[in-house]
Amino acid sequence: MLPYSPMIEEAKRQIDRSLEHFMSQIKRDYKLHLVNPILYKSIREFSLRRGKRIRPLLLILSYKGYCPARKRISSSLYHASTCIELLHNFMLIHDDIIDQSHLRRGKPTLHKILGKIVRTKRREKLGYDLGIIAGDIVYALAIDAFLSIREAPQRKERALKYFIQTAAFTAMGEFVDTLHGVENISKIKEKDVFLNYTLKTARYTFDCPLVVGAILAGANEDDIRKLSELGVLIGQAFQIQDDIIGIFDSQKNIGKSILSDLAESKKTLLVCHAYRTLHSSQKRLFIKLFNKPQKTYQDLLAIRKIFLCAGSLHYSLRQIQKRLDATFTILQHLKIRNKYREIIKDVILRLFKHSEGIAHRHHLAI
């Protein structure tokens, strides 16, 4: 993939520097290292792991796109943008505990690291308990980071409220996702899947960064509403792609166990479509494989084949494209500066190279 423009690369470097600076600041302000050196060290290491930084980047691009052209951009914007990355980390920490995952971004999950603080037969339980607490700390730090923005008080208060509402919506999505995991597949409808995608992924990954940046910059109400709609569409498409990658990509590329989504029996669009489309013996085989408590790599290959035969991969890829088309239609009508419209479009397109590659490998036109 071609590198981002120099402006985007510099913005990402500034986000990383701001995140590192914030980690040093909380060491001074909260004295986490005095409570327990491993607590601070593990939160810092987890937060600074390499990532796309897509959420803070979108917040910054949205803000710059709507603020007056001659306005000097304060460094506090980059510092505050880390709030959305910390919110992301908080979600990941708790999500990994719920899913009992061992890997995150190619390294041990935070609860696995914390479970090794002391030698005990109850190491796994200890790791889960400490991970929940560490996640709560990271959420509080996210709000602290947000408060560092220097902007008009009314805008700041409204943006903070939106940020907190987003955290609540995302937790609701996690709640629904966890319930879906134990419900019979026959009870899950496509609309339930998309509601979960909206709550658990779209709200905090795209909707919140774009809307918060626009609110802080003083964007008009119509554009704020459209940005929220656009964010939900991209977020749904992004989660569909993530589900596809979890089945059709390699563990090396995704940085977590390739069997994790299958092990948790997640009710994805792929799963929902296959169940609805398959008949008789094929459906019975699919249900048998899907409901197995301990799935093997051979089971994964069999489920991949079923998704291909049922047309579920093709259907899911077309749903991604449908949402991207709608996204770019909305983007074209926003009253955002054209330079940032094009940059945001480029950032979005780059996020979907994985699904393009998978479609190409399986000779599927979308």
Predicted regions and their residues:
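All-alpha prenyltransferase/terpene-synthase fold signal
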Residues: 1-366
